[in-house]
A protein has these predicted regions:
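Conserved C-terminal alpha-helix-loop-beta "cap" of PLP-dependent enzymes
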Residues: 231, 235-333
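Conserved PLP-enzyme active-site core in the AAT-like
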Residues: 5-233
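Positively charged, small/polar-rich N-terminal and surface patches that mediate targeting and assembly
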Residues: 1-3
Length: 334
Protein backbone atom coordinates (compact mmCIF):
# COMPACT_ATOMS: atom_id res chain seq x y z
CA UNK A 1 0.00 0.00 0.00
CA UNK A 2 1.06 3.59 -0.60
CA UNK A 3 0.27 6.45 1.79
CA UNK A 4 -3.06 7.22 0.15
CA UNK A 5 -4.17 3.60 0.44
CA UNK A 6 -3.01 3.42 4.06
CA UNK A 7 -4.97 6.56 4.90
CA UNK A 8 -8.05 5.09 3.24
CA UNK A 9 -7.59 1.82 5.13
CA UNK A 10 -7.29 3.67 8.43
CA UNK A 11 -10.34 5.79 7.61
CA UNK A 12 -12.34 2.61 7.08
CA UNK A 13 -11.02 1.23 10.36
CA UNK A 14 -11.77 4.40 12.33
CA UNK A 15 -15.12 5.18 10.70
CA UNK A 16 -13.64 8.48 9.53
CA UNK A 17 -14.47 10.79 6.66
CA UNK A 18 -10.79 11.44 6.03
CA UNK A 19 -7.42 10.56 7.55
CA UNK A 20 -4.02 12.22 7.44
CA UNK A 21 -0.85 10.36 8.39
CA UNK A 22 1.89 12.48 9.95
CA UNK A 23 5.41 11.90 11.21
CA UNK A 24 5.31 13.25 14.77
CA UNK A 25 6.76 12.29 18.13
CA UNK A 26 3.37 12.27 19.87
CA UNK A 27 -0.22 13.41 19.48
CA UNK A 28 0.13 17.00 20.78
CA UNK A 29 3.01 17.51 18.33
CA UNK A 30 0.85 16.15 15.51
CA UNK A 31 -2.05 18.44 16.44
CA UNK A 32 0.32 21.41 16.38
CA UNK A 33 1.81 20.26 13.08
CA UNK A 34 -1.62 20.11 11.44
CA UNK A 35 -1.90 23.86 11.91
CA UNK A 36 -5.65 23.77 12.50
CA UNK A 37 -5.38 25.16 16.05
CA UNK A 38 -4.59 28.73 15.13
CA UNK A 39 -3.45 31.88 16.95
CA UNK A 40 -6.40 33.39 18.77
CA UNK A 41 -8.08 30.03 19.32
CA UNK A 42 -8.64 28.69 22.82
CA UNK A 43 -7.41 25.16 23.52
CA UNK A 44 -8.79 23.57 26.69
CA UNK A 45 -6.97 20.34 27.51
CA UNK A 46 -6.83 17.63 30.12
CA UNK A 47 -3.25 16.40 29.84
CA UNK A 48 -1.67 16.55 33.27
CA UNK A 49 1.10 14.15 32.21
CA UNK A 50 1.85 16.14 29.02
CA UNK A 51 1.63 19.78 30.13
CA UNK A 52 4.86 20.97 28.49
CA UNK A 53 3.72 19.82 25.04
CA UNK A 54 0.64 22.02 25.28
CA UNK A 55 2.22 25.01 26.98
CA UNK A 56 5.03 25.20 24.39
CA UNK A 57 3.48 23.76 21.23
CA UNK A 58 0.68 26.21 20.42
CA UNK A 59 2.09 29.72 20.04
CA UNK A 60 -0.49 32.48 20.04
CA UNK A 61 -3.24 30.22 21.39
CA UNK A 62 -4.99 30.57 24.71
CA UNK A 63 -4.10 27.21 26.28
CA UNK A 64 -6.05 26.28 29.41
CA UNK A 65 -5.24 23.05 31.26
CA UNK A 66 -8.06 21.52 33.29
CA UNK A 67 -8.46 18.73 35.82
CA UNK A 68 -10.55 16.58 36.08
CA UNK A 69 -11.64 15.76 32.50
CA UNK A 70 -15.27 16.54 33.25
CA UNK A 71 -17.93 18.48 31.37
CA UNK A 72 -18.06 21.00 34.22
CA UNK A 73 -14.30 21.65 34.09
CA UNK A 74 -14.27 22.13 30.32
CA UNK A 75 -17.37 24.33 30.37
CA UNK A 76 -15.92 26.54 33.11
CA UNK A 77 -12.65 26.96 31.19
CA UNK A 78 -14.60 27.95 28.07
CA UNK A 79 -16.71 30.71 29.62
CA UNK A 80 -16.46 34.08 27.96
CA UNK A 81 -15.01 32.75 24.70
CA UNK A 82 -17.15 33.49 21.64
CA UNK A 83 -16.46 30.44 19.47
CA UNK A 84 -17.74 29.64 16.01
CA UNK A 85 -18.12 26.60 13.76
CA UNK A 86 -17.33 28.78 10.74
CA UNK A 87 -14.04 27.87 9.09
CA UNK A 88 -12.74 31.39 9.70
CA UNK A 89 -13.12 30.98 13.47
CA UNK A 90 -12.30 31.78 16.15
CA UNK A 91 -12.36 28.19 17.38
CA UNK A 92 -12.69 26.60 20.78
CA UNK A 93 -10.97 23.22 21.14
CA UNK A 94 -11.49 20.60 23.83
CA UNK A 95 -8.77 17.95 24.13
CA UNK A 96 -8.88 14.72 26.15
CA UNK A 97 -7.48 11.20 26.01
CA UNK A 98 -9.79 8.21 25.71
CA UNK A 99 -7.48 6.74 28.38
CA UNK A 100 -4.83 9.05 29.78
CA UNK A 101 -3.43 11.46 32.29
CA UNK A 102 -2.19 10.50 35.73
CA UNK A 103 -4.43 7.74 37.00
CA UNK A 104 -5.37 6.58 33.47
CA UNK A 105 -8.59 8.57 33.48
CA UNK A 106 -11.44 7.68 31.09
CA UNK A 107 -13.59 10.74 30.30
CA UNK A 108 -17.25 10.42 29.38
CA UNK A 109 -16.77 11.12 25.68
CA UNK A 110 -20.50 11.03 24.96
CA UNK A 111 -21.23 13.73 27.52
CA UNK A 112 -18.23 15.78 26.41
CA UNK A 113 -19.30 15.50 22.77
CA UNK A 114 -22.79 16.82 23.56
CA UNK A 115 -21.48 19.61 25.77
CA UNK A 116 -18.82 20.58 23.23
CA UNK A 117 -21.43 21.18 20.55
CA UNK A 118 -23.52 23.27 22.95
CA UNK A 119 -20.42 25.40 23.63
CA UNK A 120 -19.46 25.51 19.93
CA UNK A 121 -16.30 23.59 20.81
CA UNK A 122 -14.45 21.02 18.70
CA UNK A 123 -13.75 17.84 20.69
CA UNK A 124 -10.37 16.22 19.94
CA UNK A 125 -9.46 12.84 21.43
CA UNK A 126 -6.02 11.29 21.79
CA UNK A 127 -6.88 7.63 21.25
CA UNK A 128 -3.33 6.27 21.50
CA UNK A 129 -3.66 4.14 24.63
CA UNK A 130 -7.07 2.64 23.88
CA UNK A 131 -6.41 2.48 20.11
CA UNK A 132 -9.00 2.22 17.36
CA UNK A 133 -9.51 -1.36 18.53
CA UNK A 134 -10.46 -0.29 22.04
CA UNK A 135 -12.41 2.94 21.53
CA UNK A 136 -14.35 4.70 18.77
CA UNK A 137 -14.12 8.43 19.63
CA UNK A 138 -15.71 9.64 16.38
CA UNK A 139 -18.84 7.61 17.07
CA UNK A 140 -18.96 8.91 20.63
CA UNK A 141 -18.82 12.60 19.71
CA UNK A 142 -15.27 13.64 18.83
CA UNK A 143 -14.73 15.54 15.59
CA UNK A 144 -11.05 14.60 15.46
CA UNK A 145 -9.30 11.48 16.76
CA UNK A 146 -5.52 11.25 16.81
CA UNK A 147 -3.59 8.08 17.49
CA UNK A 148 0.15 7.51 17.73
CA UNK A 149 0.80 4.33 15.79
CA UNK A 150 3.61 2.73 17.83
CA UNK A 151 1.41 -0.13 18.97
CA UNK A 152 -0.33 -0.44 15.59
CA UNK A 153 3.13 -0.93 14.05
CA UNK A 154 4.03 -3.43 16.83
CA UNK A 155 6.95 -1.19 17.80
CA UNK A 156 8.69 -1.86 14.49
CA UNK A 157 8.33 1.48 12.70
CA UNK A 158 11.65 3.32 12.19
CA UNK A 159 9.84 6.63 12.75
CA UNK A 160 6.95 7.70 14.94
CA UNK A 161 3.67 8.22 13.11
CA UNK A 162 0.30 9.66 14.10
CA UNK A 163 -3.02 9.15 12.32
CA UNK A 164 -5.44 12.10 12.40
CA UNK A 165 -9.03 11.05 11.66
CA UNK A 166 -11.88 13.50 11.10
CA UNK A 167 -15.51 12.58 11.76
CA UNK A 168 -18.19 12.25 9.13
CA UNK A 169 -20.53 15.24 9.13
CA UNK A 170 -23.60 13.59 7.60
CA UNK A 171 -26.12 12.62 10.27
CA UNK A 172 -29.46 10.85 10.04
CA UNK A 173 -32.27 12.40 7.98
CA UNK A 174 -29.79 14.45 5.94
CA UNK A 175 -28.78 16.61 8.89
CA UNK A 176 -25.21 17.94 8.98
CA UNK A 177 -23.01 17.99 12.08
CA UNK A 178 -21.67 21.55 12.00
CA UNK A 179 -18.78 20.70 14.33
CA UNK A 180 -17.56 17.81 12.17
CA UNK A 181 -18.02 19.89 9.01
CA UNK A 182 -15.90 22.64 10.56
CA UNK A 183 -13.15 20.19 11.50
CA UNK A 184 -13.14 18.78 7.97
CA UNK A 185 -12.92 22.25 6.43
CA UNK A 186 -9.99 23.11 8.68
CA UNK A 187 -8.19 19.88 7.80
CA UNK A 188 -8.80 20.44 4.09
CA UNK A 189 -7.47 23.96 4.31
CA UNK A 190 -4.41 23.29 6.45
CA UNK A 191 -2.15 22.87 3.40
CA UNK A 192 -0.30 19.91 4.88
CA UNK A 193 1.74 18.01 2.29
CA UNK A 194 1.17 14.29 1.84
CA UNK A 195 3.49 12.27 4.07
CA UNK A 196 6.55 10.85 2.32
CA UNK A 197 6.63 7.23 3.50
CA UNK A 198 9.13 4.79 1.96
CA UNK A 199 7.93 1.31 1.02
CA UNK A 200 9.56 -0.37 4.02
CA UNK A 201 7.76 1.94 6.47
CA UNK A 202 4.47 1.53 4.62
CA UNK A 203 4.92 -2.23 4.81
CA UNK A 204 5.34 -2.11 8.59
CA UNK A 205 2.10 -0.15 8.97
CA UNK A 206 0.21 -2.36 6.52
CA UNK A 207 1.26 -5.54 8.33
CA UNK A 208 0.39 -3.91 11.64
CA UNK A 209 -3.12 -3.11 10.45
CA UNK A 210 -3.60 -6.69 9.28
CA UNK A 211 -2.72 -8.12 12.70
CA UNK A 212 -4.04 -5.31 14.90
CA UNK A 213 -7.12 -6.95 16.40
CA UNK A 214 -5.36 -10.11 17.56
CA UNK A 215 -2.41 -8.23 19.02
CA UNK A 216 -4.47 -5.57 20.76
CA UNK A 217 -6.72 -8.17 22.37
CA UNK A 218 -3.57 -9.84 23.69
CA UNK A 219 -2.29 -6.52 25.11
CA UNK A 220 -5.67 -5.86 26.77
CA UNK A 221 -5.99 -9.36 28.24
CA UNK A 222 -2.48 -9.29 29.68
CA UNK A 223 -3.01 -5.84 31.17
CA UNK A 224 -6.09 -7.10 32.98
CA UNK A 225 -4.20 -10.10 34.35
CA UNK A 226 -1.34 -7.90 35.56
CA UNK A 227 -3.75 -5.36 37.08
CA UNK A 228 -5.45 -8.10 39.07
CA UNK A 229 -2.06 -9.42 40.23
CA UNK A 230 -0.94 -5.94 41.30
CA UNK A 231 -4.25 -5.18 43.04
CA UNK A 232 -3.70 -8.25 45.23
CA UNK A 233 -0.01 -7.48 45.87
CA UNK A 234 0.68 -6.03 49.31
CA UNK A 235 4.00 -4.57 48.10
CA UNK A 236 2.31 -1.93 45.89
CA UNK A 237 -0.69 0.35 46.34
CA UNK A 238 -3.15 2.55 44.46
CA UNK A 239 -3.44 0.34 41.39
CA UNK A 240 -5.16 2.31 38.63
CA UNK A 241 -6.71 0.35 35.78
CA UNK A 242 -10.11 1.20 34.26
CA UNK A 243 -11.19 -2.43 34.47
CA UNK A 244 -10.98 -2.50 38.28
CA UNK A 245 -14.10 -1.50 40.20
CA UNK A 246 -11.88 0.72 42.39
CA UNK A 247 -11.04 2.98 39.44
CA UNK A 248 -12.97 6.29 39.61
CA UNK A 249 -14.02 5.99 35.96
CA UNK A 250 -14.83 2.27 35.93
CA UNK A 251 -18.55 2.73 35.30
CA UNK A 252 -17.93 5.27 32.52
CA UNK A 253 -15.23 3.06 31.01
CA UNK A 254 -17.63 0.14 30.58
CA UNK A 255 -19.64 2.28 28.16
CA UNK A 256 -16.74 4.02 26.41
CA UNK A 257 -14.10 1.32 25.91
CA UNK A 258 -14.43 -1.85 23.85
CA UNK A 259 -12.90 -5.34 24.04
CA UNK A 260 -11.52 -4.67 27.50
CA UNK A 261 -9.99 -1.71 29.30
CA UNK A 262 -6.79 -0.92 27.46
CA UNK A 263 -3.17 -2.08 27.73
CA UNK A 264 -2.00 0.20 30.57
CA UNK A 265 -1.85 -0.11 34.36
CA UNK A 266 -0.54 2.41 36.89
CA UNK A 267 0.49 1.74 40.47
CA UNK A 268 2.51 3.28 43.29
CA UNK A 269 5.46 1.73 45.06
CA UNK A 270 5.61 1.69 48.86
CA UNK A 271 8.68 3.46 50.28
CA UNK A 272 10.55 2.90 47.01
CA UNK A 273 11.30 5.09 44.02
CA UNK A 274 10.73 4.15 40.42
CA UNK A 275 14.47 4.36 39.84
CA UNK A 276 15.14 1.78 42.55
CA UNK A 277 12.71 -0.66 40.95
CA UNK A 278 14.22 -0.10 37.51
CA UNK A 279 17.70 -0.82 38.89
CA UNK A 280 16.43 -4.14 40.26
CA UNK A 281 14.93 -5.21 36.93
CA UNK A 282 16.48 -6.18 33.63
CA UNK A 283 16.88 -3.32 31.20
CA UNK A 284 14.34 -4.80 28.81
CA UNK A 285 11.47 -3.41 30.87
CA UNK A 286 12.74 0.10 30.11
CA UNK A 287 14.39 -0.27 26.71
CA UNK A 288 11.92 -2.49 24.87
CA UNK A 289 10.27 -0.88 21.87
CA UNK A 290 7.20 1.25 22.59
CA UNK A 291 4.16 -0.66 21.37
CA UNK A 292 6.11 -3.88 20.94
CA UNK A 293 5.69 -7.41 22.24
CA UNK A 294 7.56 -6.93 25.53
CA UNK A 295 5.92 -5.39 28.60
CA UNK A 296 7.32 -1.91 29.20
CA UNK A 297 7.58 0.21 32.35
CA UNK A 298 7.91 3.98 32.66
CA UNK A 299 7.99 6.55 35.45
CA UNK A 300 5.43 9.25 34.58
CA UNK A 301 6.39 11.32 37.64
CA UNK A 302 10.13 10.79 37.19
CA UNK A 303 12.56 8.23 38.61
CA UNK A 304 12.51 9.90 42.02
CA UNK A 305 8.75 9.48 42.20
CA UNK A 306 6.95 6.31 43.23
CA UNK A 307 4.52 5.97 40.30
CA UNK A 308 4.97 3.21 37.72
CA UNK A 309 3.09 3.00 34.44
CA UNK A 310 3.02 -0.45 32.86
CA UNK A 311 2.14 -1.12 29.23
CA UNK A 312 1.40 -4.80 28.83
CA UNK A 313 3.06 -6.54 25.93
CA UNK A 314 2.04 -9.80 24.36
CA UNK A 315 4.55 -11.70 26.51
CA UNK A 316 3.54 -14.14 29.25
CA UNK A 317 1.92 -12.17 32.10
CA UNK A 318 2.81 -14.91 34.59
CA UNK A 319 6.48 -14.43 33.79
CA UNK A 320 6.16 -10.64 34.02
CA UNK A 321 4.37 -10.91 37.37
CA UNK A 322 7.03 -13.30 38.69
CA UNK A 323 9.88 -10.98 37.68
CA UNK A 324 8.16 -7.99 39.28
CA UNK A 325 7.39 -9.97 42.42
CA UNK A 326 10.99 -11.13 42.79
CA UNK A 327 12.33 -7.60 42.33
CA UNK A 328 9.90 -6.14 44.87
CA UNK A 329 10.68 -8.84 47.42
CA UNK A 330 14.41 -8.33 46.95
CA UNK A 331 14.08 -4.58 47.47
CA UNK A 332 11.96 -5.14 50.58
CA UNK A 333 14.84 -7.00 52.26
CA UNK A 334 17.42 -4.26 51.69
Amino acid sequence: MDVQQLEEAWALRAGAREVRLLAASHVPAALSQLGIVRPGDRLVAFADDFTDAFERGFDGCDVVLVDPPSVAAFAAASEGYDASFDAEGPHLWWFVNSIGGFGLRVPDLRALGRAAREAHALLVVDNTVASAFGCDPLRLGAVLSLEALDRVCAGKAPRKFVAASVARSQLKRHRVDAAAECAHALLEGCGLAKLDMPADEAGVLERGLDSLDVRMQAHFDRARALAEYLAANEMVRNVRYPGLSSHPDHVVATGILEHGFGPAVEFDLIELSAGELFDALSGEFRTSLAGGAATRLSAPRGKQGSTIRLFAGTDNPLVVASVLDNALRKLATL
